[in-house]
Amino acid sequence: MEKYYPDSGVEIRGFTAKFYDNIMNIMSFGGYRLFIKKAINSMYINQNDKILDFGAGTGRNALLMNKHLSEKGEILGLEISELMIAQFKKKIEKFQNINIINQRIDQPFELEKKYDKVFISFVFHGFPFEIQKNIIQNAYNALRENGEFIILDFNEFITDKTPLYFRIPFKIIECKYAFEYVERNWKKILSEFGFIGFEEKLFLGKHIRLLKSKKGKQ
């Protein structure tokens, strides 16, 4: 199956999809595990939250989020990679409150309920701008009033002004959409879709950001 977006790096398949968690651990010298745990702690999850996980991957993030939930809390993952869905299902076998479905996040969809939080982690930057707008609208539609859209991804910066230790791997690894993503004012863009009350937490030399916003009125 061909990629929807040939210039994107977020449609992961084959070997990378099968061993994604291990690859991330090795590439980060074990640091990714600690980083993602800190980031999810910064979401300030309430124990009864219902969370929608856009681009849910292998379920690693879902398990970390679930540690903050009671039995009344829920997580639904949306993912399109069958290899990743299989890993997700294996990880959540003993958890009745976590589920996953095969669903694209870049196209309109409807769910049976509204959610307290929509979380997207290192997926958003890998889409064309017009498709990112679709994802924002999907998040808005899926949230209850005052629900939170939480984006964990690159912060805003000018690539050529970043330190070499960050700039070189960023230019080597990232797709063209990432270079456009980091130079956009996402608070302004999100506000145009009805999101308000922005909060952020920065990581890794301020190059990574957890951006939280609340659903207001469109």
Predicted regions and their residues:
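Helix-to-beta-strand junctions that scaffold the AdoMet/dcAdoMet cofactor pocket
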Residues: 70, 128, 143-145
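A short acidic, Gly/Pro-enriched loop at the edge of an enzyme's catalytic core
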Residues: 109-118
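Core SAM-dependent methyltransferase catalytic element
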Residues: 194-195, 201-218
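A short glycine-rich, Lys/Arg-flanked "PGG" loop and its adjoining helix->strand segment in the class I
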Residues: 133-145
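Conserved class I S-adenosyl-L-methionine
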Residues: 1-43, 60, 167
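C-terminal alpha-helical "lid/dimerization" subdomain adjacent to the S-adenosyl-L-methionine
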Residues: 4-7, 151-193, 198-202
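Class I SAM-dependent methyltransferase SAM/SAH-binding core
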Residues: 52-54, 58-107
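A short SAM/SAH-binding and catalytic strip from SAM-dependent methyltransferases
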Residues: 117-130
